[in-house]
Swiss-Prot record:
Single GO term (MF): (N-acetylneuraminyl)-galactosylglucosylceramide N-acetylgalactosaminyltransferase activity
Pathway this chain belongs to: Sphingolipid metabolism
Membrane topology, as annotated: Single-pass type II membrane protein
One GO CC annotation: Golgi membrane
GO BP: any one term: spermatogenesis
Enzyme kind, highest EC tier: transferase
Gene: B4GALNT1
Regions of this protein lying in the Cytoplasmic compartment: 1-7
Residue intervals on the Lumenal side: 26-533
Name under which the protein is recorded: Beta-1,4 N-acetylgalactosaminyltransferase 1
Organism placement in taxonomy: Eukaryota, Metazoa, Chordata, Craniata, Vertebrata
Length: 533
């Protein structure tokens, strides 16, 4: 019997080695298959045109330059495209790049109309979101004018003293003169200096003339700017000039950011934070009431007084109640992101912890650790890790970037695994762009980004794409929540609810919800395609 088992094991091992040998030989010699890929890199685009920014000024055209291709390749070329790694037999641990052409969600005539409408909406967006403060200003060389480079700000229809104005001219001139010109406001002075002549007080153009340089500079210290056009967030590019020299700087016009502060609550004895006063746990459920109740039970073992908010769009909702539990019902199948919006809208604490309804809290689900990260860093959101029944835990750290495309075509979204850098002072934590579906976030920032309710069945990373550039994201691998097992044992009874859930939660690649998502990304984010690792 023992020899028979040993012979069987040897046979299995021999077959496995032979299979691996054949696989290696086929991938090594077959002309139609590729070698394992190198670490992920953006797909190669067609030959790039010359960058206009590298063209010399006419007076320097005769000077030879050796272009550094490695550096030039890092610059934006505004002609991105998306390509899969393609071909080959996928091998374990081999990095593959998957590309999605979002334009394939449209027929040709519809694509032309959608592209034209999208471009029109994009130009309207630029006109709303950009201001003169975004314009490039280049300071002139060796100017005698002293002026503020940045940091001058005024509220709409209010006045300020303009700091830092001065003329550093050579002494001995008969007369000194400077001019100030504005477009959205007017100039005046808070006091008049003897020996200085003013022209244009209370107007958009102000001239100051004096035979004495010191008197002129003292007068410049008293110059005021008044906003005359009610715009809540813009900038006035003003001109400051003297004979033979002119400079420009911006005065930002806006209301100061209004804070939204939350009381931290009294600290329990020996505790660093009052988690019940700082954190609300939010989840979205659909049909899986057994899993939801298991989640709540596990939460109560460690956080008995933390509020749990539930958004529910089940067909036949069951009552879920208890201390510190809020259960909100929605129309049947309203959707994944719509449920997130509803749950987050009811949060009254500084932070919201998002969890799936089939998670299970353990001793390693330490919310204090996540709160500490947000309290002591500028991050807006920090994710943890989700542990599967196999013991494997994932943080799903994702890097997102958008590359500019050719005019009218849209941009390219790049998604790959990884992080930007470690978070100083917090071992096991990093800074990234997207995390797993278990995260603690500042409630106001989550509401600011929001969850697009048009994404009803399959969505997650789209939230981080909406927040790219405004949402500061981190991830800590040492805060872990368990994921309830999805394994179905063959001897268990058929679960109609689980089958219904699976139909809604896991649509096929050709399902209409997937096509609708591609059309949404094409228009909403002005994308033509996307690649993922």
């Amino acid at each position: 019997m023992w020899l028979g088992r040993r012979a069987l094991c040897a046979l299995v091992l021999l077959l496995a080695c032979a299979s691996l040998g054949l696989l290696y030989a086929s991938t090594r010699d077959a002309p139609g298959l590729r070698l394992p890929l190198a670490p992920w890199a953006p797909p190669q685009s067609p030959r790039r045109p010359e960058l206009p920014d590298l063209a010399p000024e006419p007076r320097y055209a005769h000077i030879p330059v050796r272009i550094k291709e490695q550096v030039v390749g890092l610059l934006a070329w505004n002609n991105c495209s998306c390509e899969s790694s393609g071909g080959g037999l996928p091998l374990p641990f081999q990095k593959q790049v998957r590309a999605i052409d979002l334009t394939k969600a449209f027929d040709p005539a519809e694509l032309r109309a959608a592209s034209a409408t999208r471009e029109q909406e994009f130009q309207a967006f630029l006109s709303r979101s950009q201001s003169p403060a975004d314009q490039l200003l280049i300071a002139p060389a060796n100017s005698p004018l002293q002026y503020p480079l940045q940091g001058v700000e005024v509220q709409p229809l209010r006045s300020i003293l303009v700091p830092g104005l001065s003329l550093q001219a050579a002494s001995g001139q008969e007369v000194y003169q400077v001019n100030l010109t504005a477009s959205l406001g007017t100039w005046d002075v808070a006091g008049e200096v003897t020996g200085v002549t003013l022209t244009g007080e209370g107007q958009a153009d102000l001239t100051l003339v004096s035979p004495g340089l010191d008197q002129l500079n003292r007068q410049l210290q008293l110059v005021t700017y008044s906003s005359r056009s009610y715009q809540t967030n813009t900038a006035d590019t003003v001109r400051f000039s003297t004979e033979g020299h002119e400079a420009a700087f911006t005065i930002r016009i806006r209301h100061p950011p209004n804070p939204r502060l939350y009381p931290p609550g009294s600290l329990p004895q020996g505790a660093q934070y009052n988690i019940s006063a700082l954190v609300t746990i939010a989840t979205k459920t659909f049909l899986r009431y057994d899993r939801l109740r298991a989640l709540i039970t596990s939460i109560r073992r460690f956080y008995p007084t933390v509020t749990v908010v539930i958004a529910d769009d089940s067909d036949k909702p069951e009552r879920v109640s208890g201390p510190y539990v809020e259960h909100y019902l929605m129309p049947f199948g309203k959707g994944w992101f719509a449920g997130r919006n509803l749950a987050v809208s009811q949060v009254t604490t500084k932070y919201v912890l998002w969890v799936d309804d089939d998670f299970v809290f353990t001793a390693r689900t330490r919310l204090e650790r996540l709160v500490d990260v947000l309290e002591r860093t500028p991050l807006d959101l920090v994710g943890g890790a989700v542990r599967e029944i196999s013991g494997f835990a994932t943080t799903y750290r994702q890097l997102l970037s958008v590359e500019p495309g050719a005019p009218g075509l849209g941009n390219c979204l790049r998604q790959r695994r990884g992080f930007h850098h470690e978070l100083v002072g917090f071992p096991g934590c990093v800074v990234t762009d997207g995390v797993v579906n278990f995260f603690l976030a500042r409630t106001d920032k989550v509401r600011e980004v929001g969850f697009d309710p048009r994404l009803s069945r399959v969505a997650h990373l789209e939230f981080f794409l909406d927040g790219l550039g405004s949402l500061r994201v981190g991830s800590c691998s040492d805060v872990v929540v368990d994921h309830a097992s999805k394994l179905k044992l063959p001897w268990t009874s058929r679960d109609a609810g689980a089958e219904t859930y699976a139909r809604y939660r896991y649509p096929g690649s050709l399902d209409e919800s997937q096509m609708a998502k591609h059309r949404l990304l094409f228009f909403k984010h002005r994308l033509q395609c996307m690649t993922s690792q």
